Amino acid sequence: MSTPDNRSVNFFSLFRRGQHYAKTWPMEKRLAPVFVENRVIRMTRYAIRFMPPVAVFTLCWQIALGGQLGPAVATALFALSLPMQGLWWLGKRSVTPLPPSILNWFYEVRGKLQEAGQALAPVEGKPDYQALADTLKRAFKQLDKTFLDDL
């Protein structure tokens, strides 16, 4: 569930971890006030969809109007970097160990899943945000939606 040493994660594997984390995180409105992931995932998906066409349009527009190539390329590269920044942030967040307050909440949610008869793999090392995302996704699928009220 968690990586033994969070600093040993390869730079490029953070992008894959970010994609996996974005797919795993439950996009529930009730989690939005506590976690920033809902907004970051939504904006990253938006950037993945719309920034490549914006970059191409900006580049073509500048070239067609006889503008300089340097600023046009810089603007296009900036537009293309926005989705990558979101995925990188999500990847870093996924391997970040949980702070103590969220850690207690994580174990309470796991306890509720076990009380409901769900088999859970034991937690290895200190849980990270990816483990929280996996647990929350499973809790929203398996438990009643009111499980957050009791926590």
UniProtKB/Swiss-Prot annotation:
Any one of the GO CC terms: plasma membrane
Family matches, as HAMAP family: UPF0208
Top-level division of the source organism's lineage: Bacteria
Topology in the lipid bilayer: Multi-pass membrane protein
Gene: yfbV
Phylogenetic placement of the source organism: Bacteria, Pseudomonadati, Pseudomonadota, Gammaproteobacteria, Enterobacterales
First-listed, main subcellular location of the protein, grouped into a coarse class: membrane
Species for this entry: Salmonella typhimurium (strain LT2 / SGSC1412 / ATCC 700720)
Membrane-spanning intervals of the chain: 46-65, 69-91
Location relative to the cell: Cell inner membrane
UniProt keyword list: Cell inner membrane, Cell membrane, Membrane, Transmembrane, Transmembrane helix
UniProt similarity note: Belongs to the UPF0208 family.
Protein's UniProt name: UPF0208 membrane protein YfbV
Residue ranges annotated as Periplasmic topological domain: 66-68
All ranges on the Cytoplasmic side of the membrane: 1-45, 92-151
